[in-house]
Amino acid sequence: MNYAIDKFTGTLILAARATKYAQYVCPVCKKGVNLRKGKVIPPYFAHLPGHGTSDCENFVPGNSIIIETIKTISKRYMDLRLLIPVGSNSREWSLELVLPTCNLCRAKITLDVGGRSQTLDMRSMVKSRQIGAELSVKSYRIVSYSGEPDPKFVTEVERECPGLPSEGAAVFTALGRGASKGFPRAQELRCTETFAFLWRHPVAPDFPDELEIKSLASKQGWNLALVTIPEVPSVESISWLKSFTYLPVVPARTSITAIWPFLNQKTSINHVECVHSDTILLSANMAPTSSENVGPTMYAQGSSLLLSAVGVEKSPAFFILNPGENDFVGVSGSIEQDVNLFFSFYKKNVSVPRKYPSIDLVFTKRNKEKTIVSLHQRRCIEVMMEARMFGHKLEYMSMPSGVEGVARIQRQTESSVIKLVSNDDIAAHDKSMRLLSPVALSQLSDCLANLTCHVEIDFLGLGKIFLPSSSMLSLDDGEFIELSPNLRSRILSFILQMGHTLHGFSLNNDFLLVEKLVDLQPEPHLLPHYRALVKEVKTNGFECNRFR
């Protein structure tokens, strides 16, 4: 601006005749201004930092030269967060309001925190300040200031923070919490992640079965639950989540994880320090693919060589990395180069296993002959089903030190889970392996011997197998029924064409494939093809009353 009012004389002064030793105010908004001039720029007046707003027609920011367009002042907001104590005190959850920081000033601020008024000294807000908030559908807001508040705080901070929804759920996430305590409001629902749902109506929502729900104690008519979204939710679940939370559902983040060796630690977001090993097992989750029929392509960059490999499965896709003599290796996806993992290796005095880490099962036949099979091998299902039918004894199970798995047992009337962990005993066939604890081995042996039990053994990336009960088998002279390769491919193609995913599925297990076929609900125009497949499945010896 070219003119300003001298604060002491009250006269209008031209910028070219003003002196830097006097004090001036804007003739329009009466806020403080100062004289700006230089060797090239002609003299002009500009508002002091923190004084005046863009509402003033003469407003010129004090930290810039004369410009035609005034930038919009960036707003800061109060943040509503959810506090959930760890452990048994989780029923004492509460809400808090996080206030933006302000410059030191002698003033007080009065806030409405959900029907309750609270006054704070703004000198306590130089650092981040949190105050308790009530459960309310009304907005949390700044009511008034008293004294001389920080002008920048008054200008930049939005006076209202949205309250809780009257219908549906407010969603809080543990990601992006920063230095403040508590969980902030979520802006989207990302697959594979866990969120806190807080709602009042409806009292008992009909959560889809594929969501993992952990309910917490209710308070003042409000319900709270921790909800975990699966990696690939169904269309029905996505629609339900959108209608209940009014938030979009987005795919899981692409990630690369080091599964083996266990002696590794993350030193930063994408840097892993790892004991030097000839075998490193990696898992690529939700990595992009170039084709629907293949898994993701991964690159490994050493000191002088770039290698690539294509995964068999889509997600998770498993890769084996041999670092050779490299002390530093980078691994990344072929499409999304931002997703990468860097390995640095260190030597360890103890010997490192040279073989692929595996879960081994040792069975003893009636003639005392021993059979050793690894859980990830194709013939494992055949060996274990033969052992169940002919009463072969499970001598022991061995695994790398530190590995944990589970055995899920489904009986006719109940189900149970056996935790499979190793002890310090060394396996007879491999000194680098440790034996399953005797208690877990005894329980697992009993379940394998009981032909009425469904048994599923799951060690994640090291192997997974499902053994059906005898009611699902049709045996003739000791031979096991199986699908022909042609029929197996046709069933698999039919399932995939209907848009179904096959999580945890193994090409070695025909029973899971048939069970997946049984659960399908094909459209009317697909029923003839479906019935033809069912007929051929029955011809192969599989029996199931649920077939149409």
UniProtKB/Swiss-Prot annotation:
Changes seen on gene knockout: When this gene is missing the Druantia system does not confer resistance to SECphi27 in E.coli.
Pfam family name, one: CoiA_N
Cytoplasm listed as a keyword: yes
Principal subcellular localization: cytoplasm
GO biological process, one term: defense response to virus
Tree of life domain: Bacteria
GO cellular component, one term: cytoplasm
Localization terms from the record: Cytoplasm
Annotated TM spans: none
Keywords: Antiviral defense, Cytoplasm
Signal peptide start and end residues: none
This protein's record includes keyword Cytoplasm: yes
Its biological purpose: Component of antiviral defense system Druantia type I, composed of DruA, DruB, DruC, DruD and DruE. Expression of Druantia in E.coli (strain MG1655) confers resistance to phage lambda, SECphi18, SECphi27 and T4.
Name used for this protein in its record: Druantia protein DruB
